[in-house]
Amino acid sequence: MRHQVKVCILELREIMREIHNYYYFLDSWTKLNSVGSLIHLFFRQERFFKLFDTRIFSILLSRNLQGSPSNRYFTIKGVILFVAGVLIYRINNQNMVERKSLHLTGLFPIPMNSTEPIKDRLEEAIGSSNINRLSILLLYFPKGKNISERYFLNPKETTGVITITKKGSMPESNWNSGPSFKILVTDFIAYLTSAFREKIPKNPMINLMFPGEMEDFIGNPTRSVRPFCSDRWSELHLWTNPTEKSTIDHKFVKNPLSFVRGAENKEIMNLLRIITYLQKTFSIHSISSDPRWDSVPKHDPDMDSFQKNSLFFLFHRFHERNRFESEERLQEMTELFTLLISEPDLVYHKGFSFSIYIDSYGLEKKKLLNEARAESKNKSLWVLSPILFRYEEIEYFFQRIIQKRVRWISCGNGLADLKQKMVVFASKNIMEAVNQSRLIQNMIQIKSSTDDGYIRNLFNRFFLLKKYDRNFEYRMQGDQKGTPIFNQRTLMKCRIKQDHTYLYKWSDGTQSLQEHLEHFLSEQKSGFKVQKRYFQVMFDQLRICMTKNLIHWFEVRKKVEKKVGKNVYKLVILLLSKSLRFFFLPQSLHFFFIKLLRFVTKFILFLSNSLTIFCVSFGNTPIQRSEIYISELKCSNKKLCNQLFESIGFQIVHLKKLKPLLLEEYDTYNFVINGGTRSPFLSNKIPKRIFDSLSTRTNHSKSFDKKDSCLSKIFHDKDNWLNPPKPFHTSSLISSFYKANKLRFRSHLHHFLFYCNKRFPFSVEKARNTNSHYIYGQFLNILLFRKKRFSLCVGEKKHVFWSRATISPIESQVSNIFIPKDFIQSDDKEYNLDKYFNFLSQPDTVIRRAIYSIVETSGTPLTETQKGDLERTYCQPLSDINLYDSEVNNFPEYLNLNSNMGLAHILFSDKYLSSENHSLCLKKGADVHKGRMSTTFQRDSSFSILSEKWNLFQTYLPSFFTSTGYKYLTLIFGDNFSDLLLILSRRVSIFQEILGLSWRILQIRLSKMPLFIRSEISSQWLHNILLSKEKIRRNTKSSLISTHLRSTKFWEFFYSIIFLLLVAGYLGPIYIFFVSRAFSELQTELKSLKSLRIPSSTIELRKLLDKYPRSEPNSFWLKNIFLVVMEQLRDSLEEIKGFAFGLNRVGPTSGVNSIRFKNKYFNINGIDIIDLIPFAHTRIAFSINTRHISHTSKEIYSLIRKRKNVNGVWIDDKLESWVANSDSIHEEERKFLVQLSALTTEKRILLSLTHSDHFSKNDSGYQMIEQPGAIYLRYLVDIHQKHLMNYEFNTSCLAERRIFLAHSQTITYSQTSYGTNSFHFPSHGKPFSLRLALSPSRGILVIGSIGTGRSYLVKYLATNSYVPFITVFPNKFLDKNPQFIDDIDIDNSNNIDASDDIDMDNSDNIDDDIDRDLATELELLTWMNALTMDREMKAEIARLFITLQFELARAMSPCIIWIPNIHDLDVNESNYLSLGLLVNHLSRDCERCSPINILVIASTHIPQKVDPALIAPKKLNTCIKLRRLLIPQQRKYFFTLSYTRGFHLENKMFHTNGFGSITMGPNARDIVALTNEVLSISITQKKSIIDTNTIRSALHRQTWDLQSQVRLVQDHEILFYQIGRAVAQNVLISNLSNCPIDPISIYLKNKSCNEGDSYLYKWYFELGTSMKKLTILLYLLSCTAGSVAQDLWSLPGPDEKNGITSYGLVENDSDLVHGLLEVEGALVGSSRTEKNCSKFENDRVTLLLRPEPRNPLERMQNGSCSILDQRFLSEKYESEFEEGALAPQQIEEDLFNHIVWAPTIWRPWGFLCIERPNELGFSYWSRSFRGKRILYDEEDELEENDSEFLQSGTMQYKTRDRSSKEKGLFRISQFIWDPADPLFFLFKDRPPGSVFSRLELFADEEMSKGLLTSQTSQIEHLFRYKYTRWFINKTQEKHFEFLIHRQRCLRTNSSLSNRSFRSNTLSESYQYLSNLFLSNGTLLDQMTKTLLRKRWLFPDEMKIGFM
């Protein structure tokens, strides 16, 4: 993966570097200068930090690199796009509309009326909306004022509560099915169309509440009014009609509700005190790190309706994790779970996916009404937790975590018509009545349900009632059938009869349940033997409880009938008889029972593993603690109940014995859980401090400073931050907590639990007091509060705060936790105070004081005067405030406050209000108190505050890269942006117009919206959008608007969307304008078509079209990329649309074009981009040649040329899409077919009346020649495209005769005119006979060795011609089933006559014919490919390929066909079919001599392999041989390549020291690569003239880029290595050779590409022979210099050796030196000794001479073996390998790292293999081996083309495709056997020692004989092994063992003198270089400066390297 990423980076860099090669881009590049300057600055660290200065940033935006002013339009556009990108990122990565303000399950709308109460009366606030109605639960009833019934009976005085009277009940997975979904959607549409209107509709669907029912809602604080998403919201729509008589007990209406506030206030204080203590004491974080812990499969079969009880789910997860977790992990989890059971209000842990689930009926109104007045002393901390969490937001939180949880929809069906009554019970025994009422309400709830799971859950809840001494069975009679229902608690039967009588009995259902259980356990056998005992104990207790403690239902019925009457029971029976029948089906019972047993089994397993969890459980059912009531334990059977609990695992302890945490106390009896005596496994391991810190008092009415309380220790600790110096501050702190949370209740009542869950999930861990981050002082300390770590006033930091200031940061953080996201502190003080006024309008004194205390303070301390004024004005003593009696009585008990409350100095850490804001608040304070609001705000004050905040942002900008500074700056920036949006919303009226228009559009469209999009819209967000206009209109009114409508994040989101729409609206019309302008031009041009009726114009136009065929204009490639981007944008929008609509769309509906564009324009490299540069052509000749044609005809001709053939393009698209997407096409053939399908008849036009080759002239004056064959082929193509190929000259005509002679002599004898114009007749021309064939040849065979540029020549001709160019790949036609040859009649191909051809004369019919038959042909091809297993079908396909290509070529004639590597079509049994077809087509084309003009060019580098049938007079009858490029030809080639792309060479280029001195490789590919590099540099430098320095830079860049191809290492010592190489080159080589480029580096570069053997041999030959110019010693010194410099200059380190050996070039220097010495010995030692070296005596170095001649074969063998590194061949590696200590992967990696870059196999005579025939014909079958992997059985096919390589990994070790090329012995995870190794021919008489031995390589002996012997007849046997494995499937170890063994033998045979010679040479070289570097002290600095100046090194690299 790392290598792939590296390759991608390298390719991207090349693309970006050469992307400027398009000349159109040169103009647009100037527009990017400002962006380029910014990019340039980003790479300089010191400049980058300066960007944070706004002045510098503004200058950069206004200037470009040249210092001139930049394009303002471009700058503005760039800034707009940048802002758009930032907004998109912000929307995606931040909750712009906070999720806490949205309903988490908002798939359906919650009925919330848009109208707000005009008055502040309580009655009007109740019915307005859910939120308003629920918000009154904290309000205080005015003294002596009751709720009037008139309000409920008069609809005109109320606001409508829109309810849904028809609802379906189904799980979420079934929402999209059935009629119930239609009902929901219908209700949803009705809701959307009526819920948000400003006025009540004419016929509103309003169900009003009776006063008693309203009181029922008020009295039950845990009841929420929500119609969806919870099965516990059963009472939602049980409202009665106004006309019905109420049966409510009206005496409850007169009771005030002050007890709610009183009890709540005290418990809030208790809870918050403990929370603040935990914040200081413990580091609060989540335990769970296992993602499996938090995730539950959505359709887990074990997750049934039981797990709606969160404890069930918890036990299930415990049971699962017990198999994997260690004992310590289970201990930690159990400890936390113990706390969760004992103090759940303090534990919210997402790891358990558990929170306290407050039942809707858990704290009924009657209990509060009766018990709260008495202020009983035995209430525990959690008693009022249902008040805190009254809105059951845990439902939302729990549903998000447990994905399986089924969301239920409360259902009602015409309740008003059935005239139901709300049942309210008033009984002295409150709990009994509550349970009875819950039973009846549950029965009513399921009246229309038909879902078994829903009813099952309902009965679960019913039997989990809070009565442990009672179990019910309810028998209903109304039918003769009775079916048992199994529940985990009891067995219930329902018998329904017609007489509607009641009979209630208890059954012995436990026996049947136990029988099933025993049967189940017996089947499990041994697995449950241990657990069976636990089962028996539980069922015994269950039987005792069910048989002895039964309370007959008849008694319960009597009690209820006294208060309710018989009508309710009749209604219940009627409903049950209609709705419960589905539940009693046998299938449902079976499913229910199976689920029950599965759960029981898991629970018993959980208990058996010593995980005794301290929770209340009954039988085998654990019961959630919030659903447990112990109020009846004082009855006569309490002893039995206690025994039951103790037997299950709980110990009942009285309070007098211990003081543990209270579970719940309603009466005088105390029921407590002891957390430390039940399980010895856990009792001693739970820290005592946990229970001590969480213990609470038994009497909550006492003050907080009680000494015997555990909590009192927290507040009386002097070293504790919660204990301020003065008691006054303590009360102030307590008050701040209360006030903050009070405001929380008032603003977001239903989200407080979600915040607690989010903020306080913790595991117990002692926090560390850190003294770091003291830079920002108080700011950091305050900020760290949110990370739940305190360091305030701890240790030495105590001096930061004085006595008064100690409490201020704490109070401010209390406010910051709960206030800022609700009361956004912005400059819009009018908006803030308006919100506060809403709260002040309510009769709540404490809230008023909290607002003054928190809001009216600022970041700066108040003066004494200000404090006095505020206290006198707002903070009056309690006695001076008109408190109600109940509040006056209760207030001192729960809050120790006096008249001096004290003003908190609040530092809003995320706002930092300025002093102006503070004074502004003070000024507005009086108006707030009096109820007056200012409706306008001064413009200057708003923007001045905004500017001050912006200045504050600039001040802290340098601290952006610190974590604290980043958070702070983010807050400031978000605040500024939000404030700016709010200011603009009041200044710009267009936004309101947009809102109004959007509102009207949405009103119309919403009713027509598809069903599936409505289910995806979040209801609250939609509600906010629709109400936005109404909100702005009532912005200054006093109304209870939901706070999230006022939040700045919402408006930021809203205006961001508007901004993005404006940007999109700008881009869209721009392109629409372009389209409209093009359309208008088209209309103008169409008018000229009328002139086509004139015959003269028609004739002229036909002439023009014949001479100048219409062509496609060159399109800018960036335009195509833009089209791709637009298509991708369209695709993404369709995907988003499909996702939003619930469709399964994966891609676009028409994704063909995107596929084509991606393939065509994104898979491009630098060379392809350069090839896109158009050629410079003049159009003057066109005007000259068409001067006699009328203007009208020219205009029509231009119109036709511009016209795009829509039909033809459609055909191309259809063909190409079918080829690209059809699965029936093989991958090998896909590229070939795509090429054919993309061909069109319209090509680029060149002026054919002029000479098309402008490059044959030699304007430079320097000798540049072309090869004769290239000249002939170029003129032949020119004649062909001028339609002269089939022209029959009339030799009797003198004019035609002269023309023909001129052309013939020019073509035939052009090779004699070197350096002259090719049209000049040579004076020494040979006589010419007119009897020869007058027409030129149509078949050309181009031969030449690899590297001569055959493919480049043909492609060059194709580029300069305007006729179609078709490539035919012969290897695609090879028949892989030769046994079918006899079944195919080749003569059938002769039946193809002219009628099958496509007539090109009538171009208009071509498209029609293709269009008509295209679908049939494509269908036929698909069908044919699907039946390829058929023999005849395979033969037909083989025939189709060759036929299709030639038929297309004939249809598109004149065209050129190129067949590379035609020698593959040899005469043999496997490809005779394709060869015969090819010969047949060539013969037919030649014999016809029809107007079909096809020029066939074939190329090969092995002419001996070409079949004689192809070389015939009427086939490939002309042979052109290309030789290696000479120096003048290289220059010509370079000149041509550069000139065709619009670049020229400077005049002094051809001087002696200029271009002539630069040596380019003889390979054509080298010249092309160099040309591309030069052009990329020229375009970057904006030069059109190429100079010598540019070419040298390109050469050096190619050499220097070596370091990017070697794998990257962290060792920067390679810089010294590079400098050392440069020093040695500059000192030793450049002065002698005048060659500034290191030849060894060029050799390495060429070796990496393996460019050719002769080229390599040339270098070695120069080393051995040209002693006057270069010596081997200099090269040895140059290769060694890098390592020596690295050793001398680099600092020693622990990994010094690793640093040296980790770099490829450093390691290969040694291999290169050794190879040079071996080569020198092979060339010099074999030919001469000391005495016969007279030719080189003067310059010869005696050090390198041999005392005696050596065997050249031994020297060559040793030289080729130098590829193996000495470190790898050491005895250590051998021993490690033999012992198995060295992994094969390590050996393979070492081989790759240290072998690839070495001169792997040197073959001095390898270049001769081209010239002499290869009798074995290795080149043919070597293709079968290419890419064959020995280690992996995988085939790597390559195209037979000169430009293809074999690449391996990122090293790009490339191997040329040729018979005797150098193939590397090693590749990444591959071994390539080189059959063309010249050593095969050298060592024919003995086993080849340099390569693998035959027996160890081949799997078949016969195969090895056929490959390794010189018997030509054995070639035929090769095809038998075509599909067999060539190599032995050996393991890696055997290969490495063989290599080591072979190298050991070679090393043993080598002479000792050679090894000593190496040592002496290298040691002397090292000594010489050391002295050189040490003596030249300034040399390092000079070379460093030179490298920096040449930009070969960069300062950052030097800084890293020299530090």
Swiss-Prot record:
Keywords: ATP-binding, Nucleotide-binding, Plastid
CDD domains attached to this UniProt entry: RecA-like_Ycf2
Domain of life: Eukaryota
Compartments, as annotated in UniProt: Plastid stroma
Protein residues bound to ATP: G1344, S1345, I1346, G1347, T1348, G1349, R1350, S1351
ATP-binding keyword on record: yes
Cellular-component GO terms for this entry: plastid stroma
GO terms for MF: ATP binding; ATP hydrolysis activity
Biological function: Probable ATPase of unknown function. Its presence in a non-photosynthetic plant (Epifagus virginiana) and experiments in tobacco indicate that it has an essential function which is probably not related to photosynthesis.
Name of the featured protein: Protein Ycf2
Organism listed in the record: Cuscuta reflexa
The organism's taxonomic lineage, starting at the top: Eukaryota, Viridiplantae, Streptophyta, Embryophyta, Tracheophyta
Gene label: ycf2
